[in-house]
């Protein structure tokens, strides 16, 4: 459950370490975002020499949330942290590596490149 002002870890090698959500995309009254939803964020912490700089505005897709997500079979999935992957405007990841597990819901939302780069899909 991500909303405005939520801080997320970045699970790719773009150079960003932490981002802050400034908008949840998908309608003017949309408040919360879950796994597979796209947000607009600003980079709060970045490593030197990375592709993105601190203060840059980016689009990102959420890959892990602490809040549990219900699946069609009745099971729930949750993670230890909130994490996102920075994407381009065509929903392709900006980085070349993904760190940590990602949820299976990304495959249903057509983020195939992120799913294929991830070391583990849960």
Curated annotation (Swiss-Prot):
Molecular function as annotated in GO: large ribosomal subunit rRNA binding; structural constituent of ribosome
Family: Belongs to the universal ribosomal protein uL14 family.
Keyword Cell membrane applies: no
Lineage, highest ranks first: Bacteria, Bacillati, Actinomycetota, Actinomycetes, Mycobacteriales
Official protein name in the record: Large ribosomal subunit protein uL14
Protein's job: Binds to 23S rRNA. Forms part of two intersubunit bridges in the 70S ribosome.
Assembly description: Part of the 50S ribosomal subunit. Forms a cluster with proteins L3 and L19. In the 70S ribosome, L14 and L19 interact and together make contacts with the 16S rRNA in bridges B5 and B8.
GO biological process assignments: translation
């Amino acid at each position: 459950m991500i909303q405005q002002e939520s801080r997320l870890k970045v699970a790719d090698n773009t150079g960003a370490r932490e981002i802050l959500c400034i908008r949840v995309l998908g309608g003017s009254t949309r408040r919360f975002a879950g796994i597979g939803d796209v947000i607009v964020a600003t980079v709060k912490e970045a490593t030197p020499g990375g592709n993105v700089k601190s203060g840059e505005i980016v689009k990102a897709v959420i890959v892990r949330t602490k809040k549990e997500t219900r699946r069609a079979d009745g099971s729930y999935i949750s993670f230890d942290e909130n994490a996102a992957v920075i994407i381009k405007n065509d929903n392709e990841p900006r980085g070349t590596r993904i760190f940590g597990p990602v949820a299976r819901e990304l495959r249903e939302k057509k983020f195939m490149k992120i799913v294929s780069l991830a070391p583990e899909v849960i």
